[in-house]
Amino acid sequence: MAAIIADKIFTHVQIRVAVWKDPFSMIEGRGLQVCQSLFAIGTGSLVWKWGLGNGRPFDIPVRESDFVFSVICEEFGVIFGICLIFVLMSSFILFMDISTRSRKLFNKLLCLGFGVCFLFQVFLSIGGVTKFIPSTGVTIPLVSYGGTSVISTLIIFNIIQGLHMLADSEEEEYEHIKAQESE
């Protein structure tokens, strides 16, 4: 509902949706980023085709931040890009594991919220690069260039690491209390 309202009110949203629907009709203008991204992913082969530095990643606008996934797929191959997605998904799964192991509701919800934010950021970035959704300009956590993005992601990882240590100490304390009660 909000997306429909935003599409009607904001012109930049209308432009992004139009580029998402048919980027090749605007290849000389606003569709250049998405078209070059799709060309890079398509020419990257399944595995390392030309070698590092022998592709043409400089043709992709904003290649260091928003469209780094297409550069990775072109330089290292689509299989490497899929492996990167699996690494990011495994981070999310670990966040959910820490969330389920926490005993306190606040810790569970905090870890769950950070994990969903992390996954949503990955989805927005890779989805925009592959034309699955309109491009949003969101970076891939810890992969794309962007100082604020890297710092905030590292803070999130540190908080989740702290929650993991708390979950371990809570588990040890719970087992200790349970052992004392059984004696």
Describe each PLM feature range.
Residues V78, L94-N107, E173-E183:
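Membrane-proximal intracellular helices of multi-pass ion channels
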Residues D59, V71-E74, F114-F118, L142-G146:
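Transmembrane helix-bundle signature of multi-pass membrane transporters/permeases
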Residues M1-C83, R103-L110:
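Hydrophobic, glycine- and aromatic-enriched re-entrant/interface helices and adjoining loop segments
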Residues S125-E183:
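A juxtamembrane structural motif centered on a specific transmembrane helix
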Residues L84-S91:
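Transmembrane alpha-helices of multi-pass, membrane-embedded glycan-processing enzymes
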Residues A3-D7, V87, V116-L124:
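Alpha-helical transmembrane segments of multi-pass membrane proteins
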